[in-house]
Every structure is written in structure tokens, then in C-alpha cells.
């Protein structure tokens, strides 16, 4: 990005377009493109773009707007107005200003967020502009004028506009983004040239019908003096008769001459009729009265209805549509296919209000009579036996004494029958081992660990190890396990300090110092020293003595 700023010139003017998706801050290259920037700034100053939309969205290319008509074919430049046709600061003040291409070598469409002027088919520019969404050097360089760039967070608002949903097959968005207002920031070199005008963006022209002119009432004609040359004109003009000089309401009805009556009839058409008493209207024949139902008199007896006469229905039955009739037939068919025979419901006794409050998952408990009651040892009507606290304590004490007597009478050693059975089982197993030959290793492998003669997978209740099933009852009845005591071997490894405290004279560890052994060997190898006899024997005797105290098993572990 720094390389772009190194090649691009610094912007000298700025403007902001406020849209429904957020503001678009545009920095303008007014020094490199003066005509285009002045056109854009003047439109922003006049609020020309307010109400316009972004009518064209091409993904990964451009978004286009600035057309007051919203069709892509409208919009004009300021140089088409008389006040901007001539520029007094130009080289030739008498030459009309035309908005043409302003191509600059340092302004290139090489990234997104660059603002350019949209060109019409005839090559002229108006008010429409576009914003690039990607690198468009191949399509737009040297073709259109680049006059600005977006700055700040406006890039994110531009991307939101570019994500708009479009009408299928076109480049027009379904819900186009609208420019709500315009704001001019820095005018740069156009401080004294760009001023606000009262110009509003014009939309598409609609043909208005001319308003119909109201017809004016003809004024009464005035009598004009007739001259020789005006005879023909006087014949065409109607002569208005003079107003009668009497009140017709006070004068009796007399016959007027025919000429006077004709003129009077013509005058009545051109002026208002005088007020006259309205003639009396003749009474029109009254319409026959409708047959309205009379309220029956309370004292009059009504006739009984004739059962043979057909009765009229109050309203015709509504006609069912074809769909409703079809659905009704389907429902009837489904109902006929269902099983209509129902199992007879079991008769249930009515529950009282208290029983209805008991949940269905509740378990009926044991009824206990109050302590000291007479019915403690009797049974309840529902079969549950009640008991008192005294009888329950006596029964529990009796069972406890029987169990304690059983413990005292039992022996920890197995009974003679069990010992005999165990010896017989061992002899039988030994005979079977001698008789049955060894099978292949593959047949002796366990299915879980694939180990020959696996003890983990071997059945613990095998007849060979546990004895025959014939003496199973004796094992169940054997009570020698009741007095069995759990005993552990001597802890000579130091896990339990009690054994060390009791046998402090036993040295469980034998320390051999190699330095002492080295000294002994060195002394014995010297020529002038006498070799002490019996020292090795004493060491061996001491080792045997310790070995006897500890035990052969523990000594082998060391």
C-alpha cells in the first residue's frame, strides 16, 4: 500500500456522501483533474446526489451511482448550464468548457476504493460516478477519469454495498442503496469558484396533461349603436328583450300576444325564473302495503299447522366444493378401515375424594398399631400383621442371640467332610493329568489373551479345582468361615514400623564399604604385613546369622 501512496499524488479536496449503509469519505485529486473535481464538488454543494441510488453493482468490478433518474442514462454536468459554460481563468475565456477525459500518468485503477467518472456511449461525462472493487487497470486505465479515492472506514461501507442482492440476469440490485445527503469538506483550489445554488436533482420527466380551462359564463350582451357597415354583424348577435316593468306576482293572468309570449319564452331561457308559488302536487297513488307479519293477539287462538303442507327451509344448504367432498370421502374410508370393536372396559369402583388424592405410584405401607395396643399381635383386615414395640424388640434380641451362638459354635477349620472332599478332588485331578495326554498349544490358548493355560480366563468353579458338584450342599452348610481371621505376613521391608520396633537387634540391611575392602586388599598385598586369618570366615558367619533371623524367603528378595 505504501508503494501506491508513493506514486499517487496527494489529494487536495474532499467530500462525503452519506448513504443508508454509512458515509463514503472521498479524497479528490483536484490539482490533476480540475474539471472533473469541480463538477463533482458543485453537485455535492447543490445536494444534487441526494435521493439518488447505486443502480449498478458488478461483483469484483465496480459499483455505479449518481444518476437522478436511477436508470443509468441520466445526469448532466455543470458545464451544460449557462453560468458554467465559460471559464474566465482558462487560456481562452471565450471558449466553451467541455468535460472531457483527464488522464494522468500517476493516477491508475490498480486497487479497490478508487472513484472515477462514468462515461456515456457518446464519450461525454455527466454526473454519474463509480467506485472500483478490485484491480481494474486492464479495463479502465486510459478509458475513464480517475479523480478520487475512498479513505478510512468507507471501504467497509463500500463492500457492504457491493454485497447487495441483484435481480436475476441484470446488474441492478433488488434493494439499492440510497444516498441521503452530501457534504463538502475541503474545497482546495475551488474556494472562490464553487458556491451553493438552488438546483434540485430532476427525476424522469412525466407528461402532464394540460389543465382543462373553465368555461366562463357569457356576460349579457350590450346594445351597440349600429352604423351602415355593421348591419351584417348585428344580424348575427341575439337581441335580448327588455325586462318587464311589472311584477308578475301582482298582475292577473292575461293573455299576451303571440309575439310577446315568444319573446318572453326566450327571455326565460337566458335569465333566472322569477319566484312563483309552486303548484300543488296531485296525490300519487300509494303503493300497495307490503305483507308484514302481524303480532298475534294474546287472546286469539292460532290455527294449528297443516302437517301435509311442505315446509320451506330458511336457507338453502351450502354447496360443498369438490375438494371438501373428496376429503370427506377419504376420512370416511379411513374410519371404516379402523378397528371399531373395542374391548370391554373393566369396571372400576368409584374412589373417594381421599383415595383420589393418593398418587398412582405410591406404595401401600405397613400398618403399625400404636404402642401398647391390644391388637399388636393380631392381623389387620388386609392381611398385614401388626406388632408392638415390645414384641419387636424381643424378636430382634432373640435373633441376635441365635446368631452369636452360631458364631461361637462354629470352627475356623474346615469340617472333616470338606477336607475329605478336597483331598479326593486333588487325587482325581492328578490321575486325570496322568491319563490325558497334552494337547496342542493352539487348543490351550485362551480366546481373550491368546495365552496358553491362562489363569485369568480359567473357570473358577471348575470341578477339578473346586471339587465335584455332589458336595455343593456341604460347602453351603459349612460354617467354618464365620470364625476365619485375616492375617498378613511379616512386614520386613519397612512399610510397617511396628515390626522394626519389636526386632531392633535384627539388621535387615547389610552395608559393604568398598573402601574398607580396598584397604584390606592393600594391606594383605604388602610384603611386610601379616595376613589376618579368619576375617573372611567371620564375615560369612555374620551374613548367615542375619539370613537366619530374616528368613530365606525375605533374604532371596534382597
UniProtKB/Swiss-Prot annotation:
Residues 201-388, 408-443, 510-558 are annotated as: Disordered. CDD domains: cyclophilin_CeCYP16-like. Residues 276-290, 304-319 have a biased composition (Pro residues). One of its GO terms (biological process) is mRNA processing. Keywords: Cytoplasm, Isomerase, mRNA processing, mRNA splicing, Nucleus, Rotamase, Spliceosome. Residues 374-388 have a biased composition (Polar residues). Residues 513-523, 535-558 have a biased composition (Basic and acidic residues). GO terms for molecular function: peptidyl-prolyl cis-trans isomerase activity. It comes from the Eukaryota. Residues 11-184 form the PPIase cyclophilin-type domain. It catalyses: [protein]-peptidylproline (omega=180) = [protein]-peptidylproline (omega=0). Pfam families: Pro_isomerase. Its EC number is 5.2.1.8. InterPro entries: Cyclophilin-like_dom_sf (IPR029000), Cyclophilin-type_PPIase_CS (IPR020892), Cyclophilin-type_PPIase_dom (IPR002130), Cyclophilin_A-like (IPR044666). It is found in: Cytoplasm; Nucleus. SUPFAM superfamilies: Cyclophilin-like (SSF50891). It is an enzyme of class 5 (isomerase). One of its GO terms (cellular component) is cytoplasm. PPIases accelerate the folding of proteins. It catalyzes the cis-trans isomerization of proline imidic peptide bonds in oligopeptides. Involved in pre-mRNA splicing. Belongs to the cyclophilin-type PPIase family. CWC27 subfamily. Associated with the spliceosome. This is Peptidyl-prolyl isomerase cwc27.
Amino acid at each position: 500500500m505504501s508503494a501506491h501512496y508513493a506514486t499517487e499524488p496527494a489529494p487536495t479536496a474532499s467530500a462525503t456522501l452519506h448513504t443508508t449503509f454509512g458515509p463514503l469519505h472521498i479524497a479528490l485529486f483536484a490539482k490533476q483533474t480540475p474539471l472533473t473535481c469541480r463538477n463533482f464538488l458543485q453537485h455535492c454543494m447543490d445536494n444534487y446526489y441526494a435521493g439518488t441510488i447505486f443502480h449498478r453493482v458488478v461483483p469484483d468490478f465496480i459499483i455505479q451511482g449518481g444518476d437522478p433518474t436511477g436508470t443509468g442514462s441520466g445526469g448532466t454536468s455543470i458545464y451544460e448550464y449557462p453560468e458554467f459554460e465559460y471559464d474566465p481563468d482558462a487560456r481562452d475565456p471565450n471558449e466553451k468548457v467541455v468535460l472531457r477525459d483527464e488522464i494522468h500518468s500517476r493516477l491508475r485503477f490498480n486497487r479497490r476504493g478508487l472513484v472515477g467518472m462514468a462515461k456515456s456511449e457518446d464519450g461525454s461525462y455527466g454526473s454519474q460516478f463509480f467506485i472500483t472493487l478490485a484491480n481494474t487497470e486492464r479495463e479502465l486505465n486510459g478509458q475513464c477519469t480517475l479523480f478520487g479515492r475512498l479513505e478510512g472506514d468507507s471501504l467497509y461501507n463500500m463492500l457492504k454495498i457491493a454485497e447487495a442482492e441483484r435481480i436475476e440476469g441484470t446488474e441492478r440490485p433488488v434493494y439499492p442503496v440510497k444516498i441521503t445527503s452530501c457534504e463538502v469538506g475541503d474545497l482546495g483550489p475551488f474556494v472562490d469558484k464553487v458556491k451553493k445554488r438552488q438546483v434540485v436533482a430532476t427525476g424522469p420527466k412525466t407528461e402532464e396533461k394540460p389543465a382543462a380551462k373553465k368555461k366562463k359564463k357569457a356576460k349579457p350582451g350590450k346594445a351597440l349603436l349600429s352604423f351602415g357597415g355593421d348591419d351584417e354583424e348585428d344580424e348575427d348577435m341575439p337581441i335580448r328583450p327588455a325586462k318587464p316593468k311589472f311584477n308578475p306576482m301582482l298582475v292577473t293572468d292575461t293573455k299576451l300576444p303571440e309575439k310577446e309570449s315568444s319573446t318572453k319564452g326566450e327571455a326565460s331561457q337566458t335569465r333566472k325564473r322569477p319566484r312563483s308559488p309552486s303548484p300543488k302536487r296531485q296525490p300519487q297513488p300509494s303503493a300497495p302495503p307490503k305483507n308484514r307479519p302481524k303480532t298475534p293477539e294474546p287472546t286469539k287462538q292460532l290455527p294449528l299447522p297443516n302437517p301435509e303442507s311442505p315446509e320451506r327451509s330458511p336457507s338453502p344448504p351450502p354447496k360443498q366444493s369438490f375438494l371438501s367432498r373428496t376429503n370427506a370421502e377419504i376420512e370416511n374410508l379411513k374410519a371404516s378401515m379402523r378397528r371399531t370393536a373395542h374391548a370391554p372396559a373393566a369396571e372400576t369402583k368409584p374412589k373417594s375424594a381421599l383415595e383420589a388424592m393418593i398418587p398412582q405410584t405410591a406404595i401401600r405401607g405397613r400398618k403399625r398399631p400404636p404402642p401398647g395396643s391390644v391388637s399388636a399381635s393380631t392381623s389387620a383386615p388386609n392381611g398385614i400383621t401388626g406388632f408392638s414395640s415390645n414384641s419387636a424388640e424381643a424378636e430382634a434380641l432373640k435373633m441376635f442371640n441365635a446368631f452369636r451362638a452360631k458364631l461361637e459354635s462354629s470352627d475356623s477349620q474346615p469340617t472333616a467332610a470338606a477336607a475329605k472332599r478336597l483331598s479326593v478332588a486333588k487325587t482325581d485331578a492328578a490321575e486325570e493329568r496322568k491319563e490325558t495326554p497334552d494337547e496342542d498349544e493352539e487348543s490351550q490358548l485362551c480366546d481373550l489373551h491368546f495365552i496358553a493355560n491362562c489363569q485369568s480366563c480359567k473357570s473358577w468353579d471348575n470341578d477339578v479345582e473346586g471339587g465335584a458338584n455332589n458336595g455343593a450342599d456341604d460347602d453351603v452348610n459349612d460354617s467354618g468361615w464365620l470364625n476365619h481371621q485375616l492375617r498378613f505376613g511379616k512386614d520386613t521391608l519397612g512399610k510397617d514400623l511396628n515390626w522394626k520396633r519389636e526386632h531392633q537387634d535384627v539388621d535387615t540391611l547389610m552395608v559393604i564399604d568398598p573402601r574398607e575392602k580396598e584397604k584390606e586388599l592393600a594391606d594383605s598385598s604388602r610384603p611386610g604385613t601379616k595376613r589376618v586369618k579368619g576375617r573372611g570366615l567371620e564375615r560369612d558367619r555374620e551374613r548367615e546369622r542375619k539370613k537366619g533371623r530374616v528368613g530365606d524367603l525375605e533374604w532371596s528378595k534382597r
